Amino acid sequence: MKSEEFDVIIVGGGPIGSIASLLLSKKGLSVCLIEKNASPYPFPRGIALNGFTMGVIEELLGEKWPDFDYTTAIEVGYVLGKDRMNEPFGKMQPPVIDGEILDLDHYGFINWFNQPQLERLLRAKIEDDGGIEALYGHEALVLWEDEKNYITIQNNSTGDTKTLSSDYLIGADGGGS
């Protein structure tokens, strides 16, 4: 490990944590990315991205963008109500103005993607970046705040622990955490 003090520590190396680490590193901040899985989790969790997010991903992936597989949806299924879970009550559709689909960013209304594939591409960009300390196979155990933010992490394969500090801490460890 290069340092134990960072501008930003990000817990969670899925798409959100990985994208945040790349964006912050581009701004010159020292970043530590902590992800409990040593390799990308093999099953998708997130499945859809809006056009703005697609633009951010295209910019970050750069030359790896052509390797990113996605499918643009023209219409998106049905919205299900809480009271009528098996009965659709409305169809999500892209905005239409004067009979034309509004597509300001050329990515379409919504895009289906494969999260494990995107995570592999983002990890490759993080490795290329050089300004991000990526600790895959490490888990956050405890965090606290004093003058700075402190976090104790554990290497999942060795059991070794280490305490890191940062000015900012981002929790991007998933919806079920």
Region annotations inferred by a language model:
Residues 45, 49-127:
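Active-site-adjacent segment of FAD-dependent monooxygenases/related oxidoreductases
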Residues 27, 128-130:
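Conserved dinucleotide-binding and phosphotransfer motif residues
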Residues 171-177:
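Flavin (primarily FAD) binding-site architecture
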Residues 10, 21, 57, 119-122, ...:
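Conserved structural-core and active-site-/substrate-pathway-adjacent residues in large, well-folded domains
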